[in-house]
Amino acid sequence: MADVVVGIQWGDEGKGKIVDRIAKDYDFVVRYQGGHNAGHTIVHKGVKHSLHLMPSGVLYSQCKNIISSAVVVSVKDLCEEISMFENLENRLFVSDRAHVILPYHVQKDAFKEKSQNIGTTKKGIGPCYEDKMARSGIRMGDLLDDRILEEKLKVHFKAIEPFKEAYDLNETYEKDLREYFEQYAPKIRPFIKDTTSMLIEANQKGEKILLEGAQGTLLDIDLGTYPFVTSSNTTSASACVSTGLNPKAINEIIGITKAYSTRVGNGPFPSEDTTPMGDHLRIGGAEFGTTTKRPRRCGWLDLVALKYACALNGCTQLALMKLDVLDGINEIKVCVAYERRGEKLETFPSDLKDCVPIYQTFKGWEKSVGVRKLDDLEQNTREYIRFIEEEVGVKIRLISTSPEREDTIFL
């Protein structure tokens, strides 16, 4: 059986810590979408690990780690992450169906961002997915055979010829790209496998599989705050599509949310706090992007968005992250509805323009940092947790009270 860990905000919810915390109970940890535009930070034995492509189970020797077919892969960045760890042979597997990000994709991404101003990381993620959908991309499996790779490169060079000048590709681009693959393909080849068959077989054998999403539900290309979204499907449903596991293989769906809200980049954010309180949350929560180092926009928990995300994913339980960041705040706000042009909205609309948050205020608490038992939390803290559970209709089974792995309350 497989369990899914999915972010139910705009990403950066703390999925890495949760996967790292529970990975010891699984045989496989699988990253199922996105690219190195996403980052997750794991603190293990006091050491901070910032990962972008590598599944979070890499710190557990018994875990097999898979990068599955809907992930887009920068082979250069993956090689750099591989070099951070030892003994990854037979522990890391990259789907032969996953698509490869090319330098051209990065150039195109930067060019488009100048005019669209979506707030992308300019890592080439979107253009790589574009080529995938146009059925013209290069896949990881193509790197296993030099002849096939050369054929794919010739098609690629022909396709981009009209755009070389626009995307600032120099005269040596073809030579440089061939040298790029000559450098990195041999390092990656030992890890490229048919992960779809591997996971189907593992599921049939009853092995435990943890499916790890990137970004968050509200950045989903179809169901998020379009056009300020990522280029992949970020909901739990995409875990099946990417891995080849059928929906009946899914057991628990664990939704990850912070005790407040953040967003990086542009796009609507109704509960954003632009007063010094927003700065307080940013500093207290160390809210700076793992990938871009950009400061995240911060605000109060948005239950309208949270209920929407839980419904989309079919969450069976929640993990509440960074509760300790709210320590010492006298009054804590929660967005319970929106007002838009005189109308009260309790459901999440496709367009958040003109949506103003309606808040409910709670008394704050002194301290929760480092607490590992529910009974040790102050009454006001427990009331805040209970309110979230009741409003969303999903039980909170895990609460994080610091970045450290052990500072976790299991319910």
Curated annotation (Swiss-Prot):
Looking at the UniProt entry, the stretches that span the membrane are none
Answer yes or no on keyword Oxidoreductase: no
Listed binding positions for IMP are 12-15, 37-40, 121, 135, 215, 230, 294
Where Mg(2+) binds, per the record, is at 12, 39
- Per the record, what are the reactions this protein catalyses? IMP + L-aspartate + GTP = N(6)-(1,2-dicarboxyethyl)-AMP + GDP + phosphate + 2 H(+)
Residues noted as binding GTP in the record, renumbered to the chain = 11-17, 39-41, 296, 322-324, 400-402
**HAMAP family per the UniProt record, alphabetical:** Adenylosucc_synth
Name listed for the protein in its UniProt record? Adenylosuccinate synthetase
Q: Which organism is it from?
A: Helicobacter acinonychis (strain Sheeba)
